[in-house]
Amino acid sequence: GIFSKLAGKKIKNLLISGLKNVGKEVGMDVVRTGIDIAGCKIKGEC
């Protein structure tokens, strides 16, 4: 019915926004790690 359609949409939206947040967190970690590695390569410390 209408309710299950709405609930499905809401759940889907929550999942999508949750995944986006997780993606952002993981992305930031990857970026930070990349910056650390680049920094130590430039300084010749790794």
From Swiss-Prot:
Single biological process term from Gene Ontology: killing of cells of another organism
Keyword Metal-binding: no
GO cellular component: extracellular region
Pfam families found in the cross-reference section: Antimicrobial_2
InterPro entries for this protein: Antimicrobial_frog_2
Keywords for this protein: Amphibian defense peptide, Antibiotic, Antimicrobial, Cytolysis, Disulfide bond, Hemolysis, Secreted
Major subcellular location class: secreted
Disulfide bonding pattern of the chain: C40-C46
Record's subcellular location: Secreted
Tissues expressing the protein: Expressed by the skin glands.
Domain of life: Eukaryota
Annotated function: Shows antibacterial activity against representative Gram-negative and Gram-positive bacterial species, and hemolytic activity.
Family: Belongs to the frog skin active peptide (FSAP) family. Brevinin subfamily.
Name of the protein this chain belongs to: Esculentin-1A
